[in-house]
Design a protein with these regions (language model features):
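Non-heme di-metal
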Residues: 1-191
Length: 191
């Protein structure tokens, strides 16, 4: 690979690293807020996504060659809001990454002869697009009162003990372990 020092791609990698690192922290804060509001699954999804953002940051960081580098970039300077507000803010950030920032960074990397880095920006965009969709779907569920209630009978799983309940609404208290509704999620059989 050609020398990265002094290229626009080097700055883009550091910008992406900083953005992913900050997103990771924001998502851990958002996870705490969701848990406090009674959305355990959404809290866990924020935490899972934070871990994925850490891996994106690590991938970008490993391309860098050391030294000092000054970048100028804009980052969200928001607050920790309600779960709904946090989901919407997270989705907006993810959309910006997959639809604008990373495609632009990939193009620049390829123009500068860094095809592998360009490909990595494109592949991480795929993950960011899925993060965006998941956050928007979860926000719609929160906004429409559909986190613990569905339009038809489905299976709900207690995330604490594994008890399965069938109905259009998750039970208020798990009859097996006595944990509140906050610990229920739609049963996924995706194995």
């Amino acid at each position: 690979m050609a020398n990265l020092k002094g290229t626009k791609t080097e700055k883009n990698l550091l910008t992406a690293f900083a953005g992913e690192s900050q997103a990771r922290n924001r998502y851990t804060y958002f996870a705490s807020a969701a848990k406090k509001e009674g959305y355990v699954q959404i809290s866990d999804i924020f935490t899972e996504t934070a871990d994925q953002e850490k891996e994106h940051a690590k991938r970008f960081f490993k391309f860098l060659e050391g030294g000092e580098l000054e970048i100028t970039a804009a980052f969200p300077a928001g607050v920790i809001g309600s779960t709904l507000e946090n989901l919407k803010a997270a989705a907006e950030g993810e959309e910006f990454e997959w639809s604008k920032m990373y495609p632009g960074f990939a193009k620049t990397a390829r123009e500068e002869g860094f095809d592998v880095i360009g490909k990595v920006f494109e592949m991480i965009s795929v993950a960011e697009k899925q993060h965006d969709k998941r956050y928007r779907d979860l926000a719609a569920n929160v906004q429409n009162g559909r986190v613990f209630k569905k339009d038809k009978k489905i299976k709900w799983r207690c995330r604490n003990c594994g008890y399965v309940h069938e109905g259009d609404t998750a039970v208020d208290l798990c009859p097996a372990c006595d944990h509140p509704q906050a610990h229920f999620e739609v049963l996924a059989e995706n194995w």
